[in-house]
Amino acid sequence: YLSWKLSEILTKSIADFKGKIVENAITGLQMIINELEVHFRLIGEFNAYNLLAVYGTAILLGMDSTEVLTLMSNLHAAPGRLEQVQNNQGLTALVDYAHTPDALTKVLETINEFRSGNEQLITVVGCGGDRDKEKRSLMSAAACQFSEKVILTSDNPRTEDPEKILDDKMEGVSHSNRRKTLRIT
């Protein structure tokens, strides 16, 4: 019964718990959940789904809705999950350890949702050695699709040749995107 209700929440169909994104900004999500408006420090549509699932689970377990939303509004992103780092010159870096092409695409789509147009998106993509070689070129292609500049690195090469890792990643970089792509070993 619980899993059925939660699956309804995530399907964008009629459900016991409803959520609407009012604003998705770098400062967080402004949402209406079951007619209560609340600000969350997390960003991105995927986090809105996660928040709604947590809310629904807590309510089904008997918690008070206002208390649940208050607690959830104080949540911070896990380290390395769209984590914001700012410097004293007003530059913002978002760190995310996306480790699949789909995850990287979702992160970059999220960032592009709240860009005003003047910012430059520079994406650093590292792939470790002795890991899934098939995703290397796909991650590079995703980075090139959504970014003004791309920096490819071999991260932790382990027993692999760092240059070979970068060669694999460059297979996902089209000829037209090579000028905006930098390799660093």
PLM region spans:
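A short helix-to-beta-strand connector/capping loop
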Residues: 15, 88-91, 175-182
